[in-house]
A protein has these predicted regions:
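A membrane-topology feature that recognizes alpha-helical transmembrane segments
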Residues: 1-157
């Protein structure tokens, strides 16, 4: 339905994810405008992919559940607020099953990133535990999910 719009929206998402991952690596923060742009661009993505009103409601419901679950991690001090918002914004782009796949990939990448940071801490014999820029894992998992055509078939559900 969306023809040429779909690749441009996917490219915009890719650029936003790259910028968010780089920003998180440098500053341990993700700007609210990036997460807002990711979330808002999901609306034309839905239209371009021909989602019905019911499908859009499901997308929104899944994103709200994802936000609530990861908000609990934020409250527990295990994850930053920008990370939580980015995960929920990405959930708006993906069919429910693909959200689960993206979260599994994100967890594996985040675990690997954590191990790298722990190894670096041990190598430098640093006493303080560095914050993990989890936005990197979220961004890569999101890029993989959008790039994988088996995960993003909206009309097949």
């Amino acid at each position: 339905m969306g023809g040429i719009v779909v690749p441009w929206l996917a490219l915009a998402l890719l650029l936003l994810l790259v910028m968010a991952g780089i920003e998180d690596a440098r500053t341990r923060e993700i700007a609210n405008w990036k997460n807002a742009a990711i979330a808002l661009l999901a609306l034309p993505w839905w239209w371009a992919n021909g989602l019905s009103g019911i499908d859009m409601a499901w997308q929104l419901g899944v994103a709200l559940i994802v936000f609530a679950l990861f908000f609990a991690a934020f409250v527990a001090g295990q994850m930053g607020g920008g990370d939580v918002k980015m995960i929920a914004a990405l959930a708006l782009w993906l069919p429910p099953g693909a959200v689960l796949s993206m979260l599994m990939v994100m967890s594996l990448l985040g675990g690997a990133l954590t191990l790298l940071f722990l190894a670096d801490r041990w190598r430098r014999r640093a006493a303080q535990v560095a914050e993990i820029p989890y936005g990197i894992a979220i961004a890569i998992a999101g890029m993989l999910a959008i790039a994988n055509p088996f995960l993003t078939h909206f009309g097949d559900a």
